């Protein structure tokens, strides 16, 4: 009996040691976030072991775990009709809100899920619940795109998928089928999905047949650049769940089918050092010392290497492509974008990407709403139902839907 108690105590202590990580006091529901982070770290470690044993790619294994525990079939309710179909060969899940006699045509949001271009699905519970809520509360048609993921495809195929599906949806006959008002359409996405949404928005401004087709864009803690991994938010949140800096840099390398040997050099900005001529012209477009308010720069210092590794940009020229990094787009492109909503979270390495993009858009003459949550963390908006419900998740979702309701 005594030995059992000792063993149990030891196991509890080990579990507590694994789960506990120091978190800022201002983050929402810290103990719940620790448990969520421990669960995700555990799944990552299992998938890394599977990869090491040569059984499967670690991202395929990790996504199998995520989707297996969270996949939801297309289930319709009295309020929202849900169907799985495809738009020009790209899988989508469509959510149709309840009809209103006084409004025969509905507004619509094309939504792109996050997951580092490699994980999650439009068909998992978190995104299904988000899109269902949007369809019901906005009385809208929500098109959630199931784009192909790394490692099955790499940049720019994810962008091609979302552009192809959205172009198909914008056809007059398709909009008529779903009873959508062609003047009330928004493109939106979170995290990597926010990156894809921003890239799509920019691409549409450069296509005469698609210009002015989108009324709004709404970007939720978007990934917008890979040239500076030492912005104040990257420095402040270097180990903050659920997206530590090291993990984000690896997602970028995976997106470009790059070499993991580059990760450590990229973390210290060796890929954009002063001797890397290819990056020189783009530095001003993400100069956070001028783009961020003093309340965010605090006492952080820029990390600019004099000499670095030019080979990284030479082997991964995608780093300098505005389709992967919308923050570095030309001002002439930005000024053509529609009214924009950007949601950022204090405890997120990507915080400054969103804030800098908001500033560049404002400078270009675009109307921007920057919605910042002091207790938010990366990914929080999809965590709104038990057991992974967070106070800030509910508040961010409500704020996002409220903005759509008022502007779409």
Curated annotation (Swiss-Prot):
Major localization listed first in the record, in broad terms: membrane
Organism: Pongo abelii
Family matches, as PANTHER family: AB HYDROLASE SUPERFAMILY PROTEIN C4A8.06C, NEUTRAL CHOLESTEROL ESTER HYDROLASE 1
Segments traversing the membrane: 5-25
Keyword Glycoprotein recorded: yes
Membrane topology: Single-pass type II membrane protein
Gene Ontology biological-process annotations: ether lipid metabolic process; lipid catabolic process
Protein family (similarity comment): Belongs to the 'GDXG' lipolytic enzyme family.
Protein name as annotated: Neutral cholesterol ester hydrolase 1
Segments on the Lumenal side according to the record's topology features: 26-408
Carbohydrate-modified residues: 270, 287, 389
Keywords: Cell membrane, Endoplasmic reticulum, Glycoprotein, Hydrolase, Lipid degradation, Lipid metabolism, Membrane, Microsome, Signal-anchor, Transmembrane, Transmembrane helix
GO cellular component terms, A-Z: endoplasmic reticulum; plasma membrane
Enzyme active site: 191, 348, 378
Domain of life of the native organism: Eukaryota
Cellular compartments annotated: Cell membrane; Microsome
Pfam families according to UniProt: Abhydrolase_3 (PF07859)
């Amino acid at each position: 009996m005594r030995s059992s108690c000792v063993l149990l105590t030891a196991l509890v202590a080990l579990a507590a040691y694994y789960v506990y990580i120091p978190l800022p006091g201002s983050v929402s529901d810290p103990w719940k976030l620790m448990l969520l982070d421990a669960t995700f770290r555990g799944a990552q470690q299992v998938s890394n072991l599977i990869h090491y044993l040569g059984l499967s790619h670690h991202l395929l294994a990790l996504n199998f775990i995520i989707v297996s525990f969270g996949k939801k079939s297309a289930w319709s309710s009295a309020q929202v009709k849900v169907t799985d179909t495809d738009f020009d060969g790209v899988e989508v899940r469509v959510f149709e809100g309840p009809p209103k006699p006084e409004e025969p045509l509905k507004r619509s949001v094309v939504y792109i899920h996050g997951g580092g271009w490699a994980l999650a699905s439009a068909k998992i519970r978190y995104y299904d619940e988000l899109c269902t809520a949007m369809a019901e509360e906005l009385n809208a048609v929500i098109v959630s795109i199931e784009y192909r993921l790394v490692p099955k495809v790499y940049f720019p195929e994810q962008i091609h998928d979302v552009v192809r599906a959205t172009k198909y949806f914008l056809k007059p006959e398709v909009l008529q089928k779903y009873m959508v008002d062609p003047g009330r359409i928004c493109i939106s996405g979170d995290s990597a999905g926010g990156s894809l949404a921003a890239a799509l928005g920019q691409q549409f401004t450069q296509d005469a047949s698609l210009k002015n087709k989108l009324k709004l864009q709404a970007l939720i803690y978007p990934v917008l650049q890979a040239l500076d991994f030492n912005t104040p938010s990257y420095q402040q949140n270097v180990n903050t769940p659920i997206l530590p800096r090291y993990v984000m840099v690896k997602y970028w390398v995976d997106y470009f089918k790059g070499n993991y040997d580059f990760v450590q050099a990229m973390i210290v900005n060796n890929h954009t050092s002063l001797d890397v001529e290819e990056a020189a012209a783009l530095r001003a477009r993400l100069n956070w010392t001028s783009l961020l308010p003093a309340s965010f720069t605090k006492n952080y210092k820029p990390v600019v290497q004099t000499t670095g590794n030019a080979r990284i940009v030479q082997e991964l020229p995608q780093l300098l492509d505005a389709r992967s990094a919308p923050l570095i787009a030309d001002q002439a492109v930005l000024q053509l974008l529609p009214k924009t909503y950007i949601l950022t979270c204090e405890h997120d390495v990507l915080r400054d990407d969103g804030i800098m993009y908001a500033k560049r858009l404002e400078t270009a003459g675009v109307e921007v709403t920057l919605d910042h949550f002091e207790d938010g963390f990366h990914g929080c908006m999809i965590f709104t139902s038990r057991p992974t419900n967070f106070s800030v998740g509910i508040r961010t979702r409500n704020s996002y839907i409220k903005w759509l309701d008022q502007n779409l």
